Amino acid sequence: MSYSLYLAFVCLNLLAQRMCIQGNQFNVEVSRSDKLSLPGFENLTAGYNKFLRPNFGGDPVRIALTLDIASISSISESNMDYTATIYLRQRWTDPRLVFEGNKSFTLDARLVEFLWVPDTYIVESKKSFLHEVTVGNRLIRLFSNGTVLYALRITTTVTCNMDLSKYPMDTQTCKLQLESWGYDGNDVEFSWLRGNDSVRGLENLRLAQYTIQQYFTLVTVSQQETGNYTRLVLQFELRRNVLYFILETYVPSTFLVVLSWVSFWISLESVPARTCIGVTTVLSMTTLMIGSRTSLPNTNCFIKAIDVYLGICFSFVFGALLEYAVAHYSSLQQMAVKDRGPAKDSEEVNITNIINSSISSFKRKISFASIEISGDNVNYSDLTMKASDKFKFVFREKIGRIIDYFTIQNPSNVDRYSKLLFPLIFMLANVFYWAYYMYF
């Protein structure tokens, strides 16, 4: 029994050794096949100097770029910038990395540290960062002809100079510009790989307040003190969606103006009611004007379209309050005139009687025969009105007529005319406002 167990143990041991030998032979064959197909990175980079660009001292390196716009997360009018996440892909040819075969191989992103890569940066960028979750979002791919593909995922905040004079019916033009930091046009030449088709993703973006109308790519030359640099420009137009602002600002302000007209149908004697409506609408309009400016920069160089409309609405609301003040004051003046009417009539009768009695007594005392008229003793200036007194008399008469012309004879007509004029003028102001800012 023990002898049979011993033989079984020996057989199992020999079988295990045989299997190990076959496994080692298989691994050797696999490693040999890998060495035949994969370029040895150590062999490729032997004598490779990552601090020198390809074709150093010769023709410039031609770098072709493509962009994928993943998102535009925010567009800030107060800071005049936008934040975007992009996939930046750069392609160039490095003759030092040529290997046999017709395959391409993706390398670990950490091997980028051993290769030359272009020093591309984003012009007018306020801040940018490379995503690192779960690893650095970079890709390096080598082709057998020496072509290198280098891809990055970047989030950047870029300046966008905005003209807010037509806000919120405005269209903004923003740019994303790429350029080499240190290599001028003699060392590096940038180009778009497929023209406008080099940029993708913008047509699929959905923004909260904007619609992307169009975009196009440009290649320009930036002239600086250190040389001329090739610059790639992506320019896109953003048209603001005005519907949001119509519901948030324009409709409430219009309703406040219409509410202020309600006082025209209230009696002049209802002082508390009309005063309350006027003051409430003025204060509400002021609050709406202040709230509309909280999210915008303090721009002193231009007046925005929304400020113009709110100013128009505030003028009508305040005008309705002044209209009641004028109508009420005219009503009080008319009542005062009516109260003074009987007293004034009796006063005029007394004055007439006194004048008539004085004239009759004066006629009895004066005898025209006793008056000796002598040319040397008569002062004609005493017998005629002076020119200055005549001018004052005529001027006072004219002023009195003008005052009587503008004096409101019937205060109830003020409300009657206001019911027609205020809505008519407000509608005309809206027609001119929307026609100007929408089509000019």
From Swiss-Prot:
Glycans are attached at N43, N102, N145, N196, N228. The chain crosses the membrane at residues 242-262, 271-290, 302-322, 420-440. One of its GO terms (cellular component) is plasma membrane. GO terms for molecular function: GABA-A receptor activity; GABA-gated chloride ion channel activity. It is found in: Cell membrane; Apical cell membrane. InterPro entries: GABAA/Glycine_rcpt, GABAAp_rcpt, GABAAR_pi_TM, Neur_chan_lig-bd, Neur_chan_lig-bd_sf, Neur_channel, Neuro-gated_channel_TM_sf, Neuro_actylchol_rec. GO terms for biological process: chloride transmembrane transport. It is a multi-pass membrane protein. Keywords: Cell membrane, Chloride, Chloride channel, Disulfide bond, Glycoprotein, Ion channel, Ion transport, Membrane, Signal, Transmembrane, Transmembrane helix, Transport. Residues 24-241, 291-301 are extracellular. Residues 263-270, 323-419 are cytoplasmic. Disulfide bonds join C160-C174. It catalyses: chloride(in) = chloride(out). Residues 1-23 form the signal peptide. Heteropentamer, formed by a combination of alpha (GABRA1-6), beta (GABRB1-3), gamma (GABRG1-3), delta (GABRD), epsilon (GABRE), rho (GABRR1-3), pi (GABRP) and theta (GABRQ) chains, each subunit exhibiting distinct physiological and pharmacological properties. GABAARs subunits share a common topological structure: a peptide sequence made up of a long extracellular N-terminal, four transmembrane domains, intracellular or cytoplasmic domain located between the third and the fourth transmembrane domains. This is Gamma-aminobutyric acid receptor subunit pi. It comes from Rattus norvegicus. The gene is Gabrp.
